[in-house]
Amino acid sequence: MNIDSLLHTPSQVISSLDYRRERWRNGLGWTREILRLPAQGDDWALRLSVAEIEQDAAFSAFPGVERELVLLQGNGVRLRFADGRVAEVLPPHGRVRFAGEEALHGELVDGTTHDFNPVSYTHL
């Protein structure tokens, strides 16, 4: 799917009451998907979600995608990448971008966070 066809994909407004709370791929957190294009199937090109990080945990791998994490609520999270980099995502609305295949571990600063997560395939 290219960006032009993605922009012409049918869409709909989803009420927040209809968001499904689902476990992360690795089972160590929660997410509420708010947009997926295309809307059906597992072969998406763009995905927007809000994650709840409740404990220090490894992040799920999403090879071939560009990820971003934007702090919406909470005292922040420290991301430790396998290559030694550390990114602190702190209030009010700290953010970080990274490749989906990067191995990383999140450490909560002080309590649960809610984070906005735009994720898209890098070939778009």
What are these regions (language model features)?
Residues 35, 49-51, 119:
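Conserved hydrophobic/aromatic positions in well-ordered beta-strands
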Residues 1-42, 59-64, 78-116:
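A short, N-terminal "cap"/entry segment at the start of jelly-roll beta-barrel domains
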